[in-house]
């Protein structure tokens, strides 16, 4: 669980996009390419933002189930 996971996923999305660029169906090829590649890139961006925000939260979570004398 680190930044390398994001890099590895990015490289796999780039590889899948390159494969689909070559193997796209011949009729409406431009539509297929742009639809699939844009969909994969936007899903990667949403996943990466969510994953990285969970790794490095802006607000530190607090436990609410502690007794007051043990709470900080």
Curated annotation (Swiss-Prot):
Keywords: Hydrogen ion transport, Ion transport, Membrane, Transmembrane, Transmembrane helix, Transport, Vacuole. Residues 24-34 are cytoplasmic. GO terms for molecular function: proton-transporting ATPase activity, rotational mechanism. Subunit of the V0 complex of vacuolar(H+)-ATPase (V-ATPase), a multisubunit enzyme composed of a peripheral complex (V1) that hydrolyzes ATP and a membrane integral complex (V0) that translocates protons. V-ATPase is responsible for acidifying and maintaining the pH of intracellular compartments. InterPro entries: ATPase_V0-cplx_e1/e2_su. The chain crosses the membrane at residues 3-23, 35-55. Pfam families: ATP_synt_H. It is a multi-pass membrane protein. This is V-type proton ATPase subunit e. PANTHER family: V-TYPE PROTON ATPASE SUBUNIT (PTHR12263:SF0), VACUOLAR ATP SYNTHASE SUBUNIT H (PTHR12263). Belongs to the V-ATPase e1/e2 subunit family. Its main location: membrane. The gene is VMA9. It comes from the Eukaryota. It is found in: Vacuole membrane. Residues 1-2, 56-72 are lumenal.
């Amino acid at each position: 669980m680190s930044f390398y996971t994001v890099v590895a996923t990015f490289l796999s999305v780039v590889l899948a996009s390159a494969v689909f660029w070559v193997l796209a169906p011949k009729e409406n090829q431009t539509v297929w390419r742009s639809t699939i590649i844009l969909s994969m890139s936007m899903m990667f961006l949403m996943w990466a933002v969510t994953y990285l925000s969970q790794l490095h939260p802006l607000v530190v979570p607090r436990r609410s189930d502690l007794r007051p004398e043990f709470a900080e």
